[in-house]
Amino acid sequence: MKKSQKRISNVSEIKAQLKTVETKVHNGVFLFSGIMTIAELAQKINVSVNQIITYFFHQAKMYNLNHSLSEDEIAEICLEFGLDFKKEVQIDASNFMEEVSILDQDKDLSPRPPIITVMGHVDHGKTTLLDYIRKTNIAKNEKGGITQHTGAYQVVFQGHIINFIDTPGHEAFTQMRARGAKVTDIIVLVVAADDGVMPQTKEAINHAAAANVPIIVFVNKMDKPNKDVDRIKNELSALNIVTEEWGGSNIFVYGSALTGQGIDTLFSSILLLAEILELKANKNRYPIGTVIEAKLHHNKGTIATLMVQNGTLMVRDFIVAGYQYGRIRSLENTNGQPIKFAPPGTPVIVTGLNYVPEAGDKFFGFHEEKFAKQLALEKKQSEKISKTKVQTKQQTKEKTLNIIVKADVAGIAQALHSTIEKLASKQVHIHILHSGVGIVNKADILLAQTSNSIIYAFNLQIPAAIKAQAKQAQVEIREHTIIYKIVDEIKKQVRGMREIRYELQQIGTAKIIAKFWFSKVGSIAGCSVLSGKFVENCKIELWRNSKLIHSGKIESLQRDKNPVKEVQVGNEFGTHIYKFNDIEIGDELKAFLDVEIEE
């Protein structure tokens, strides 16, 4: 990038989208940003408070004017009173990294290098493959090799750059996804030709599916005499990873990480898929990307590896990552060589930050320190509020029980998987993210943390270190040795999660035949039951001349000055209506009870 060439500012993009949503009716559409009270909603849509309260009363919901309505309830009221509705996202410092859309014009976009993560079962050759690729790149680099672990590196194949994120495995991949980072474009799944699909292979596939990342399969160890390629294809097809040879959409590459067989084919396949994915970015803007890793060096201070995904990062740029900001002092490529700038699709080692960002933090680059500082400060101040909003939002989503199943033998794991899926109800969906054989491991904990899952471990000993990690990550591991106890436990969870629905059923009618006034209580209605019955604390409607006057509940129920629990047809009783005194002789009372509706 030329020094004189100006970059598009992220400041203008963000400022343009930072907004406070004005709650109002516009062209028959009610615009709102979140929950509000009945009184607030009534005022905004020009409907009386009583109309809204009565609407919810008929749904067995006893609300007052200060009750806060959920987004779904606001939508219900809008539809009830003939309005369309639209929720608009309010964007501020607490959520701008997630909500701000950076839209570049097509003419400004150009292809960027793909970003690859290699995953696979232990001992299937993931590390050997990465080592071979890394050494190949070092050999081509005349200025020397990589002297430190940077978390990411680049290779050049036929003039095209490919990025590899070098992580310890599924754990790091999941940690990034847990923090909302979408950094990987393609996953290369390594499967040993002489071993087949193993537990961590399934884990990797589940991780990829959860992150919606396409998979290229590298069938490794093709130099082994006991390889069985058909077995690999069959086992992977059962997991919805189907080779193109069989009409599927997954590219399979056959080779050996030890000898280098198939590596060039793998590179070609990556570039082909990257072309299909149309990975593009605008190099002429300030940078946006993800923190790959960071550490504190005793001499250099913070050293961080960043993946630039859009825009160009330069020395002296200010960046906001997490809820802090800093200024870039130096840039190095992953070979440790100084560079002047890092375009899109470039892993870069930076110094100058006065804090250590976390892996998976998204970062934005700016030329204005004032704006970066303001955003970081506001984001920090809103962190606790933001967490509360997330929890509230999660509670209002469709109810899903996420589960991970681990067992000592495959047959039990399969049986549990099948049995648990059948325990879902109409209101509560059960999603089994992963089921497998063997002890609960770090990858299980991280997947559970990411997806808010419960881990069920059948007939397994959980290592103390794993229990400690689960506790720290606030992940539940439930250990069992009897299947029906797992079933009973999940049934209780499903019952506890479902929204209890009630139907308001009319149980009786009465006529007010006398009224009295007591200064300590208010109006007392003397009533005669015309049909059905009245019960203690039942809900009522008061009607006068065929017009609904009041919806509420009775506060007491007495016969001959003695409190009673119910009064049957043909009998008389006295009652006081809660916080309501405007009664007249001849008024009709209708009694209602909430009845729970079974699914």
From Swiss-Prot:
> Record keywords: Nucleotide-binding included?
yes
Gene name of the encoded protein = infB
* The species this protein was found in: Mesomycoplasma hyopneumoniae (strain 7448) (Mycoplasma hyopneumoniae)
Extract the HAMAP family matched here. IF_2_B
Where is GTP bound in this sequence?
Answer: 120-127, 166-170, 220-223
CDD domains listed in its UniProt record = IF2_eIF5B (cd01887), IF2_mtIF2_II (cd03702), mtIF2_IVc (cd03692)
The similarity comment for this entry is: Belongs to the TRAFAC class translation factor GTPase superfamily. Classic translation factor GTPase family. IF-2 subfamily.
Q: Its Gene Ontology molecular function terms?
A: GTP binding; GTPase activity; translation initiation factor activity
- Region described as G1: 120-127
PROSITE patterns for the chain:
G_TR_2 (PS51722)
GO cellular component terms, alphabetically, are: cytosol
Q: Which UniProt keywords apply?
A: Cytoplasm, GTP-binding, Initiation factor, Nucleotide-binding, Protein biosynthesis
Q: What is this protein called?
A: Translation initiation factor IF-2
Domain called tr-type G: residue spans: 111-278
Region G4: start-end pairs: 220-223
Region of interest called G2, as start-end residue ranges on this chain: 145-149
- Alphabetized InterPro entries for the sequence: EF-G-like_DII (IPR053905), IF2_II (IPR044145), IF2_N (IPR006847), P-loop_NTPase (IPR027417), Small_GTP-bd (IPR005225), T_Tr_GTP-bd_dom (IPR000795), TF_IF2_bacterial-like (IPR000178), TIF_IF2 (IPR015760)
Matches recorded under Gene3D superfamilies? P-loop containing nucleotide triphosphate hydrolases, Translation factors, Translation initiation factor IF- 2, domain 3
Compartments where found: Cytoplasm
Q: What task does this protein carry out?
A: One of the essential components for the initiation of protein synthesis. Protects formylmethionyl-tRNA from spontaneous hydrolysis and promotes its binding to the 30S ribosomal subunits. Also involved in the hydrolysis of GTP during the formation of the 70S ribosomal complex.
